[in-house]
Amino acid sequence: TVTVAGEGSYTIDPTTGAVTFTPEKDFVGTAKGVTVQATATITNANGKTATITSDATYTPTVVPAVPTTSPATSKDIQGATQTGTPTFAGTTVQVNGEDKAITIKDNSYTLLDKDGNEVSTTPAYAEDGTTPIGTFTIDPATGQVTFTPTDKSYTGKVTPVKVQAESSNGIKVDTTYTPEIVPVTPTATPAETKDIQGATQTGKPEFKGGTVEVNGVEKTVPINEDVPATFDDGST
């Protein structure tokens, strides 16, 4: 075996002389090649023998064949679960007049965590890249990524998560999915009362759920009537 750093490795079948080149995954272009030597023994009419050798080179060329990618984004209101599916597309390359199709391997979709490890779930961070605000999970069969917020008070962009897929020729490519959280603020109408000196008075401010337009659709977050009203210091 002969290994050329940055290119790949060569093996030879000593019986047939066939050379096999196994390229490194990122190598493209024409390799430096290797020298192949054959030895033969000849015998002349007098019965004397001699050994002769002959050298030849083998030079492989690797044609680029990388899938294409497109990132995904989504936008929704505070507290909503969001999904996005980045696009991974195969390609076709022509080699020696023959079309060769490159496809995406089944069930090869995965997330990459902050350290570049392949994972099926990973924390989601605020735009600062350090504050955890939720989780990302992925469907390995479809590549759909789900963002589930845990800090429902956070609004703004979420740090993009890397999404990876592998092609049929063993090339791993990645792109991103970026959710954005739109703030929704409930509205309040103050209450006023008037009565005589010493009389107990009762008033009830009116609260309505916040409404915002997201991607052309009006969305409302209703007031949770199961949560009791309190004063601004939390007391009742």
Language-model segments: which ranges?
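C-terminal edge beta-strand
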Residues: 44-64, 170-183
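A short beta-strand micro-motif common to beta-rich folds, especially ectodomain repeats
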Residues: 29-42, 156-167
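Solvent-exposed strand-loop boundary residues in beta-sheet-rich modules
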Residues: 42-46, 115, 169, 233
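Surface-exposed or secretory-pathway low-complexity segments enriched in glycine-proline
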Residues: 1-16, 22, 54-58, 81-142, ...
